[in-house]
Amino acid sequence: MSNRGNLNLNLPPSSGKYTVGENVHFELSKEKNNSTNSNPHTSSTSTSNSNNTGIGVAKSLSTNDNNNDNDNQQPQQHEQIQSKAKSQSQSQSQSQSQPQTQVQVEQQQQQQSLVNSPAAQLAAKKRKKKKSKKSSNNNGNNSNTNSNSNSEITNTSISMPHAFLNNPDEDYPTSRVIKQAPNGDVIVESLDHVGGTYEDHLHDDYSDEDTLHHHLRQAPHQASNNNHIHNHSHTSSHPLQHTPNHLHHASHNANPLTQHISASGASMRSHGHNDAHSNLWDSASLEEQEKLKEFWESLEESQKLDLVKIDKQSIMKMFKNETRQHLQQLLQNGVLNNQNASSSNNCACKYCGRRNNIIEEELENIYDNHFDDIIDFIHEVRDINDLNALPGLLFGGFHMLEEERRLQKRKQLHNEHLELAKSSNLQNQAHIEEIRAQMDKLKMNQRQQSQSQSQSQSQQQRDVQTAQSQVLSKDSSLKNANTSMNKQHTSQQLLQPQIQAQGKNNLQQNHHTHHHHQQPLQHPTVQISATFLSSNPTETQLFNKLLDPKLFEALESLDLQKMKEVSHFDPQNTAHINMLEKAGSLREIVRDLHNVDRNHLEKGMSYVQNMGKLFSNIASLNPSNPEDAEKIMTGQLNEQFNQGLSTFAEDLLKNDGSSFISMMETLSELRSAREELLKEKTPYNGLLTKTPAATSQDREQQVQPNHSHWLDEDDHDHEHEHEHEHEHEHEIDDEDHEHYCCHHHQHHHLHGDEEYDEEDEEDDEEYEYGDDEEEEDEEDEEEGEDEELEEVVEDDVDEEILDDEEEFDAKNASDTESEISEEEKMQEIRRLFLIQVIKLFQERLKSAYKEKVSKDNTRKLFEELEAEEAAKREKEAKKLKQKEKAKERKRLQQLAKEEEKRKKEEEAKRIAEELHAKQEQLKLEQKKKKEEARLRREEEKKKKLEEIKRREAEHKRKVEEQIKHDEEQRRLKEERRKELEEKKRQKEEEKKQKELLKKQKEEEKERLRIEREKQLEKEAAVSKSIPQPSPKSKHVMKLAATFQSDIPSKQNQAQNGNQSHLPPQSRLRQDEENPQKTFANSVFSAKEYNSIYQPLPGSLSNNSSSAALSVGTQLSNFQALSHPQQQQQQYSNDIYLPSANLATATVQSPRSAPINLPNGTSAVGVSLANHLSLNNSSQGSPWTTNSTLSSNLGSTGLSHGQGQTVSGVNTNLPSSIGITSGGASQIFQPQPQPQLQPHQPQQQQQQQQQQQQQQQQNYFSPFNSFSEPLVGEPFQGIVHPTTNINNSTTASSSTGAIIPPMNPSGNIWNSNIGATATNAPASVSRNNSVWSNNAITPKPSEPSFLSTAGRSSSLWGTLANAPVASSSNNNSNATANYDNNNVRSLGSSSFAPANPGQHELEVIQTAIYNCFQMMQNSNQLEFNVAPLMAIFSNVRSLTNKTQLTVNQFLNCCVSNSLYQFDFVYDDFGTVTHLKVGLNGLNDHNSVNGFSKSSTTPPLLPISAMNSKILGYTQQQQQQQQPQPQPQSQQQYPLQHSHQQRLLQLFSNNQTILSQDVTSSAFATGTNTQGSSYGQVQLGAVSPAFARTSPPGLFPNDIPLLSTINELNSTPSTGTGTGTGSGVGAGTGAVFGSGIWN
């Protein structure tokens, strides 16, 4: 919108705005217009008109760069132009209309802010006085200098502008004002949004300018680094910063680069107020800065990158423009003209303009060679590519960047010092001891040192008293803190007296000294300061966070007591004494500092700091005094030091107040009076030449230790290189001016009043026009204030002193420059380029922002003008509207009527529609209800139909069930009828069989006689070849010889052998034709049962649930014979049981009864099922018998010829069974049997046959589940054919053993009974069994193999059906095989007896008991009973009998003397659970002379039972798994397997596992002279069987195995007609015939 220029349009103070309604045109006089050509920034601007309306203000302004300097100008007087639009339009109504233009007024903020400032006037006076003195020294005429100054002021002043209207006839809007922005732009604002007055803007501009120039001045100070070479009096551009006269000087021989660096910094300071970029950045308010930041953020990425692009051309252009602008400024100010006489063309600085090209070339070379280094440095300071952080870089400038780095380094150094302090505590203690030793030495020279010190102290006191006369208004709250802090300060000066004494002569000679000359002597003080600071690290850290150390230094340097003493110099300050005394502590000033905002807080802190620099008390304590030094060294001040730190930090955070602010306001009102007092009191000038060195040295010694801990990196680099001179007027200061060089303190003491006035003026102005910058460096403020004070003092300095200082300063400057390293030069170069880069960025952003602001202002102006035009058009429209209102009213009334009519019509129409809709809705609802009713009726109809169907189905089901029930009843009746027919048929067959038996017995008698003779001969021959047995073996054989059984006839064996080789059809046909013969072959002799266990009188149960036999009824003995004669011979001497008592069948409930069997364990047989039927007897359930039997073996009276048994078969009945009928107890009394004879009486045979028939016919099953015999199960006996070597009458050689075949299907639930062998008769089917056995109902002509007709009603009577076992000897053992026909081999002696059913029963019962115990131990029982299927599966897997069925398993669960089995039935009578227990043994009972032990036999381990007892190994068990075999091979698998196991277990010297002997399998007998004997060869036995018999049961500790295997089997020989000899002679029966079975 406008171009920036160096123009000065100062509006009147009373009115800071123009009223736009006054069409004003400004024209300035042409006095200074010729100078504008030299300034490239001078502009005379005019803007185009806009729509013939707006502002027609044209300004032709002359740029006056002398106003930028503000050193030689008086305040500009401005004319306030106010006239009304109407009067101007009337007075100039005939003027031509000129194009309306908008004047873009541009002005520097500095010039605007200094117009009416009293401070500016005072500064101008002081500078004029200084210049007049200098010009008088140069020219000798003060009046000429003053006239020249006045002429300069006159020449550079701006003429009063004349205003006139461009277009008086035009109607200009009066709603806007034109005013000037702080950046020089013309702002057109609405009256509603105008805020503030001109004075307010001037106030803000002044304060902003003041603050910014501190920053712009500080940056080149840092860059200069005391290396600048200036020999000319160039004025400073800072309005309040008077030209300092204590600048550093260097020789003119310095290189051009150094000169340019110095000049560049000075140029930036002097020209900073009229540079294009300075106003925007230096004087921008916070609001405008925020706008600039928002503008930056609104830019796009590409635009931001364009703004921050760094190129060589732009940077070099910045250097050149800066140089040219500075030269033009100097020309305008007449500086070069004044210096031509003295310097001519010998000056080498850039201000003379002679070496500009060389400097520019040098800069270009530096840029080319060190571009990367410079860019790295810029990035190190702040990443300029971080576009978001760039506004902070632009506003903060180089000074802020350096401050950030300084703070970081300061923190780093502080942390390092803390660590060093901690690590060096012990070393410090040692140093303190050394210092104490030095203090002792100092006592020796105390007088000499005290004299020299007293002189310097007295001089200092006088100077301090003089300088402190004007500080009575200072806050007395610093008094108490000053006491402790002065002690702390003095504690750091213990070694200074010696340093002062050494440096005094040098100071008096040279008047100045360098700090680095005394650095080696000050390190003990540094260590002491570090010790004090590190002794309390917590307080030190808090202090470092809350307050800058330099401010703390200033606070501790105050001595307000002495300020009060000199208060009489200013009588006006006496009114403030009471306020000073009331403060009492540091709280007041801390509260004031805490209560103000940030900028004012920084001002106040700087104020207090400068106060401390001026009025620090040096002589409060005497460091040379031994008492004071000892007090300090012993740490007594440490507590006060820490207390001061804590108090200051606490008050800074907590307290508040306004005393500090009110104090500063009061001081600002008294500046004028004190200024006059300063001018009058100047008698202290003479002191300058007396003690400046001493005062300076004392100040340096007092300040230097205090900063030893807080110096940053730059301070350490340059703290010893500051030398201040008083002649040169260039301002080249660096950041370390706060170290209070000697001239500062000298002038402070001499001119305290004047300095205080200047300082108060400075501070008050800073407070009044506060700084709006984000941060402010206190060091820079100190520097500026020091320079101002030095300027004031410089006016009173004699010319001779200035000359001397010039010469001395030149020497020191050359020395200083020689010490600058190349690295420092490169650092300054980097800083210089960084400054230029920042300025470049600022210029670009400023230009872009100004362009945007200009466009926005233009747009706003056009918008306002358009709004005004719219207002005019609106006025005209109003008139038209008013005219049209009447018409509109009429039209509206008409429309209202029409609308009302239309509404009525619509309402009627709407009502009709609603009525119609309601009717439609009602119809729909009625239709819906009808539909719902129809659906409900259909649904109910469906439900009724479904109910009818359901009832019909239920009725049909009931009818079917009734039909099924009727059919079942008919079937049951038919079955009963068939049963009766079958019984009848069986009776008939039995009659026929009896007749056949009679014939067979007769033939058998003859055959047996022949066989005995042959057998005796053969045995006599074999006995000769038998080796002599051991003593135990002989004893057992003797016992066994007495119990030899009769030998079956050879005829029976041959007949059975012939029958076994017949095909199944032929054998079945034979069985049907001759059932009596088949039955005779399937049973075995059970005479042994009558010889041991016979019921005693009264032992039968009186329970009504048992069926009884008549008195004298005894258990039948069945012998499976091959011929009827053999069978008749067998049964000729048996005990007869009345068959009439067997016909009665009563339903009995199952009940367990204890059956005492003295056997501790059981020998395992193979075949069980074909010899055991548990519930076929009509006399009741076998396990409910409660009767006991008493052994009456001695009264048996069996003859020698009647003890006929089958080899290896246990035919005795060990359990006691009581059979009652009608509640009467019957006693089974053993009949005296004569010796075995070849023939038996015919009557006895008939009676035995009748008993067998009755047992076969009497079927009974309480639950119709066990009515079938086990013969029909897979264990049904099969007669195996055997070969007979000789024709002896051995039963074992002539008969085949019944071996139960395995169930090939393996189905325990559905065992096919029809797959039995031919010789095994069919069994009755179980109709109501839960397992539904598919049994084949036998034909009426077929006798049941285990029917109740031929059995006893007792449990053990079922064993009478066991056939005669074959003693066919397939044994390969030569020592045991004596005679294949007469002697039992090992294979059939123990585990393959002729009666395998009993043997198998014991195995299964033992396994059942062990499984029950296992389940009980593992908590698998259910209410102390085991589930049937669980224990059944365990027993089957344990015994390796995979084809064992549930029916067979239940038949084996028979209670005996050893085990007791209890069943649990369900509602249908099916067994669901089983309980197994042990029965107790009676000690008073004895069997065959052996007492039965009551000790429960130990249970064998399962592994022993499974492998040891059965003789299995795991490999053999796997081999013994049932395999599908042909029928011819399945007939005798178990017998063969038993023989193999016995061969492996009991073969000679092959399976000897223990020395405990057990009976082997050898039993022989002879019939010599009517005597029988038995020989038993003992063999080794498994440890599992060793000594397992009950104690005392057998003599000579015969093991249980021999009892089971030997004594329990019937010898194969021993039948004859003679009288038996040996043990058991006269009994004619065997020793162990079934006592364990």
Curated annotation (Swiss-Prot):
- Where along the chain is composition biased (Acidic residues)? 754-808
Q: Which UniProt keywords apply?
A: Coiled coil, Cytoplasm, Stress response
Q: Which cysteines are joined by disulfide bonds?
A: none
Question: Where does this protein have compositionally biased stretches of type Basic residues?
Answer: 124-134
Question: In what ranges is there compositional bias, type Polar residues?
Answer: 1-17, 471-487, 692-706, 1049-1063, 1201-1228, 1258-1267
Q: What does this protein do?
A: May act as a negative regulator of salt tolerance.
Q: What is this protein called?
A: Stress response protein NST1
Organism for this UniProt entry: Lodderomyces elongisporus (strain ATCC 11503 / CBS 2605 / JCM 1781 / NBRC 1676 / NRRL YB-4239) (Yeast)
What taxonomic classification does the UniProt entry list for its organism? Eukaryota, Fungi, Dikarya, Ascomycota, Saccharomycotina
